[in-house]
Structure formats: structure tokens, C-alpha cells
Regions:
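Short N-terminal binding/cap micro-motifs at the start of the first secondary-structure element
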Residues: 45, 77-79, 110
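A short beta-strand-turn-helix
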Residues: 44-66
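C-terminal cap of thioredoxin/glutaredoxin-like
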Residues: 34-48, 71-72, 83-91, 175-252
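Bacterial N-terminal signal peptides
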Residues: 9-16
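Local sequence-structure signature of Cys/Sec-based thiol-disulfide redox active-site neighborhoods
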Residues: 59-88, 99
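Structural alpha/beta surface segment adjacent to cysteine/selenocysteine redox centers
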Residues: 83-184, 189-190
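Boundary at the C-terminal end of the N-terminal hydrophobic targeting segment
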Residues: 19-21
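Bacterial N-terminal signal peptides that target proteins for export
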Residues: 1-7
Length: 252
């Protein structure tokens, strides 16, 4: 299979998934101005202030025919919704793709009031609706019982995990998402981050050290890259071939 053919089939796979998702019908209030209110019709957790500043930011260095740069966030409900498709993509095209996971910083803090959201409890009902739409288990009660004040801590922890092992870092991301979406755990708390690290074979002590130092810089670099590439929300995937040609899939 040629590189061009590989890219074509992979893009077709993702575009079909996007179209199938957008064909579902669900009536929800239009609150997508707030990033925590992901729009099921487009599959996007929006970043209202994102602006594109540099279209040539990425230089491809992949060893496989296609590199996918995946901008995501640990508490992005649409990103949780795309998990089955992403796993299928890896199973069908794993020999031809490599995925570069990047953090986008969905929720810096609660110092804003946008799109009908002013406090964590406003998100609870929305997550329940998203669960029905994607047919993925999500328990919105986390926002009533033990709400998160930011998505930055688990994002930085993921960058620290990547410093140890890329494969284990992906497993770590899956685990902390299970914690927040299924188990109602506040994954900004170190006790849960440390537990997820240990369960996925990471060195929790080293993770803590990196989390407090180098991982912060790596996370900030991801935010800058997202800004430069014009990422407006999550999930966003850039498909790049060996000639540095790019295609973007936005939403789900």
C-alpha cells in the first residue's frame, strides 16, 4: 500500500466516523460558547478565543507513512466519545500511523462566565446528555459531588507520563478518563493521579518530580502549538504525510 493510499483510507475512516456522529439527532441548548459544553452535533469542545497564527508550525519527522497529531484534554467529553473510533483506527492502521498526543488546556479555571456556565454544577446535566448522545458511559454527578477546578493538573501529569513512556502515557490517559467519567474521581487531586500512574506501570515518584518541573514546560509548549496551529476545540486531529502535507479532522 502506497503512502498516498494509506492516508486516503485513514482519512476516509475518520471522515466517515465524523459524518456518522453528526447524523445523530439530539436536541440540546446551544451553549457551545463555553468549552465544557461540547456540542454533540459537531462533536467539538470549543475554545472561543483560539486564533490561528502560523500554518507552517509543524515539520513532520515520522517513521511511519502517516503521523496524527491529536489535540485533546482529559475532561473533554467529546474526546471520551471518540475513544472507540480511535481504538479501531489503531487496530486497522496501527502499522501505518503514529499518534502524537498533545494537550489543549480545556479548563484553565472557573474565573469566567460564558455560554450559560458559571459554576461546575452547570456542567452535570450536560455530561448526562452527552453520554446518551455518544452512547458512552459518563456520570455527570462528579460536577455536583467533587468538581474539578481545572483540567491543567491531569494534563500536566500526562506530559510527565510521556516523559517516562509514550505507550504507558496513553494507558494513563485512558485510566484517568475512566476515573473522571465513570468513577466520579476528581483527577486534579494527586492521590488519583498517583494511583492511575501506579496502575499503568509508571513510576509515581518520578512522575511527581516531573509533574512539578519539566512537564509544566512541555504542557505550555503544547498550548502554544495548539494556538499556532489554530486549534479551536477538541478533539482536533492533524494527519501529516512524509511530504508534510496536512489534513485536519475537527470534532466527531
Amino acid at each position: 500500500m502506497t503512502k498516498a493510499t494509506t492516508l486516503f483510507y485513514i482519512m476516509s475512516f475518520l471522515i466517515a466516523s465524523v459524518c456518522n456522529g453528526q447524523q445523530k439527532q439530539l436536541k440540546m441548548e446551544n451553549k457551545i460558547n463555553n468549552p465544557l459544553l461540547c456540542d454533540p452535533e459537531t462533536g467539538v469542545c470549543e475554545i472561543p478565543t483560539a486564533q490561528k497564527t502560523n500554518d507552517n508550525e509543524i515539520v513532520s519527522d515520522q517513521k511511519k507513512p502517516v503521523k496524527i497529531i491529536y489535540f485533546t484534554d482529559p475532561i473533554c467529553s467529546s474526546c471520551w466519545g471518540i475513544e472507540p473510533q480511535l481504538r479501531k483506527l489503531k487496530l486497522e492502521y496501527g502499522n501505518n500511523i503514529e499518534i502524537d498526543y498533545r494537550m489543549g488546556g480545556l479548563l484553565p479555571n472557573w474565573s469566567y462566565n460564558s455560554g450559560g456556565i458559571s459554576k461546575p454544577s452547570d456542567v452535570a446535566h450536560h455530561w448526562d446528555e452527552v453520554s446518551l448522545y455518544y452512547d458512552m458511559p459518563i456520570d455527570g454527578d462528579i460536577w455536583l459531588e467533587n468538581p474539578l477546578n481545572s483540567s491543567y493538573p491531569p494534563s500536566i501529569a500526562f506530559k510527565a507520563a510521556q516523559m517516562q513512556d509514550e505507550t504507558k502515557a496513553v494507558q494513563f490517559m485512558r485510566r484517568i478518563r475512566e476515573m473522571v467519567f465513570l468513577e466520579k474521581k476528581n483527577i486534579t487531586l494527586w492521590e488519583h493521579i498517583s494511583k492511575a500512574a501506579s496502575e499503568t506501570g509508571l513510576d509515581a515518584v518520578k512522575l511527581k518530580t516531573d509533574y512539578e518541573t519539566k512537564a509544566i514546560e512541555l504542557f505550555e509548549a503544547d498550548l502554544e502549538l495548539a494556538k499556532n496551529m489554530g486549534v479551536r476545540g477538541f478533539p482536533t486531529l492533524f494527519f501529516i504525510d512524509s511530504q508534510n502535507n496536512k489534513q485536519m479532522v475537527y470534532g466527531f
